[in-house]
Amino acid sequence: MLKELIDKFYLEREKEKRRKDKGRIRFFISEAGKCPRMIFFRFKKVPAEEIEPERLRVFEEGEVIQQRILRHLLSLGIVRATEIQIPPQELITGRADAIVSFTDKTFSDLGIDLEEKIEPGIPYVLEIKSISGKINSKKLPLPDHINQLQLYLHYFKIKKGILLYLNKDTQEITEFVFDYDQNLVERVLNWFSKLKEKIESDVVPIRLADWPNNWQCQKCEFSEICKIAGEKEISWEKLKREIEKLEELSQ
C-alpha cells in the first residue's frame, strides 16, 4: 500500500530527472573517469533500464548525509560558500559541495591539536562522499572522486581540496587533502575531449577492459545494449541496426 506509493514517487521523480538531462550538451563533472560507453549512451538518449526504487533511496541518502555534514560545518563558521557552480564553458558542467577555510584559532579554540600546519585563510574545495561499508577503506580515495575534485580546483583556481568520506554503515569519517595537480587535470580534460569526438562522430567507445566485473557494470542501466555492442568500438548506426534486428526477431 504505502510501499507502492513511495516507490512510485521515486520512479516518477527519476523519470523527470532523465527527461531534463536529455537536452544536455556538456559532460557532468561527476562523469570524469566513468565508463565512456555509458556516457555515450546517455548523450544519445538510449532508453535506460529502470533503476530500482531502493537504489534511488540510497542515492538520496547520500544527499541527506552531505547536507547534514554541511550544517555542522556551517555552525563552525568555516564554510565560505556551498553548491558552487563551475564557470560556464563548453565541455563540462557541475557544482562543488563547498569551499571552506580556517582561521589560526579554528582548531585551537576547540582544543584540537593538528600535526599538519594549516595556513589561515587558504580556501579548500570540499567534496563530501557517502560510501557503503562494503567498500574497503584501503581503496580510498577512489580515482573518479580524485578526478572530480581536481577539476573543481582547476575551474575555481584553488590550490587545495578535501575529499571527505562518510561510511553509511559505521558513520566513520575519512578525509584526504590534495594539492592541485595540473598534469592530472590535463589528462582528464583530454579524456573528455576525446570522448566528445566519439559522441559527435557517432562512434560507440570500446567496452571497459574488466567488463562485466567492473563495479559500474554490476547494475548498469545499459547492460543489455552494451552486450549487443560487443567488446570493440562500433558505429552508432550499425549498433542501432543490430538492435532493430533483435527487436524484429523477438516479435
Regions found by a protein language model. Give the residues of each.
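Hydrophobic, Leu/Ile/Phe/Ala-enriched alpha-helical segments that form helix-helix packing faces
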Residues: 69-73, 77, 153-156, 196-199
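Metal-dependent nuclease catalytic cores that hydrolyze phosphodiester bonds in DNA/RNA
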Residues: 1-125, 132-134, 143, 240-244, ...
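Residue-level recognition of conserved beta-strand positions in structured domain cores
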Residues: 128-130, 165
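A residue-level signal for conserved active-site and pocket-lining positions in enzyme catalytic cores
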Residues: 35, 152, 220
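Short, charged, amphipathic alpha-helix that recurs within catalytic cores of restriction-modification
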Residues: 141-155
